[in-house]
């Protein structure tokens, strides 16, 4: 029996972690993956946009197209002195592999490659096509990554049928949760206008903080929707608020407020914008506002992809998975609008973005097995 430390998926994960690919850097991770995929018949298409390295790899010319999607970039390490081991020196301690990106998401990338190698060895004449969509711009501004690759594919009418994103979806144990959808995300940047002046002469000024306070209080208490069986109710949160010069004797001339909606399929971004701007007008505020669309909500219901994933997790782990739509956004939001069915399955997310990020070594092998079974269910 192969020791867990020597699993092929463990070795590949370690090789990826050793490349310090802090967003938007790739540091050769995609080249390493491409070499493995090219050896089993994949056509490799690098797509570099500005500072971002992307890869579209495909084996086969027919549909349906099953796509593994993920990212090679990682978040910064934070205070290195707080790490038990150097963050880019992959180290196994008590059955856990430590290193930045171990769980988010170099372990998933390695599992995808290993699963595909095994699947192709067993089924060289599989149905349809297998693809990889990999970017180095998921943890950053997500401008030149997956969204640009999707634009390229759409322009030539190259469609993805099913996409499996390797984001760390699991909560307590591998596969206990999969993400079969995500809420939409909409950010508002609001400037409430006033007139700067001396605090001793308020009649000669117009305090935007005083003017905006009742509006913000009402906005924060508004009911947006009730959610549904798949999504919680839409949430509104103020993320940043700034006004004033820092002096105690100056009434500010403007108030800057940044806020975010995480919204369900019960509303649209257009409805949210309309309601916010109607409230601004009702409070008779002078303002400028700009909106950033971070992603539409999407949902993958019962069907081949979710069914195959349920079967794989049950077969490999012995328990049932729980499909959820909670949490933040992922690059799945750029793939779903094309009509693809999108699902997220990856390691336990307890340590992602933290110091001492780690993944259970045995989970990496189980994840590779899950991915392999999913391929068998969909392409055999």
From Swiss-Prot:
Cofactor(s) annotated in UniProt: Zn(2+); Co(2+)
EC number(s) reported in the record: 3.5.1.18
Pathway: Amino-acid biosynthesis; L-lysine biosynthesis via DAP pathway; LL-2,6-diaminopimelate from (S)-tetrahydrodipicolinate (succinylase route): step 3/3
Active-site residues annotated for this sequence: 73, 138
InterPro entries: ArgE/DapE_CS (IPR001261), Bact_exopeptidase_dim_dom (IPR036264), DapE_proteobac (IPR005941), Peptidase_M20 (IPR002933), Peptidase_M20_dimer (IPR011650), Peptidase_M20A (IPR050072)
Record: residues binding Zn(2+) 2: 104, 139, 353
Positions of transmembrane segments: none
One biological process term in Gene Ontology: L-arginine biosynthetic process
Keywords carried by this UniProt record: Amino-acid biosynthesis, Cobalt, Diaminopimelate biosynthesis, Hydrolase, Lysine biosynthesis, Metal-binding, Zinc
Pfam short name (any one): M20_dimer
EC class: hydrolase
Annotated positions binding Zn(2+) 1: 71, 104, 167
SUPFAM superfamilies assigned: Bacterial exopeptidase dimerisation domain, Zn-dependent exopeptidases
GO molecular function, one term: zinc ion binding
Note on cofactor: Binds 2 Zn(2+) or Co(2+) ions per subunit.
Keyword Heme recorded: no
Signal peptide range in chain numbering: none
Function: Catalyzes the hydrolysis of N-succinyl-L,L-diaminopimelic acid (SDAP), forming succinate and LL-2,6-diaminopimelate (DAP), an intermediate involved in the bacterial biosynthesis of lysine and meso-diaminopimelic acid, an essential component of bacterial cell walls.
HAMAP family to which the protein is assigned, alphabetical: DapE
UniProt similarity note: Belongs to the peptidase M20A family. DapE subfamily.
Subunit structure: Homodimer.
The protein's name in its UniProt record: Succinyl-diaminopimelate desuccinylase
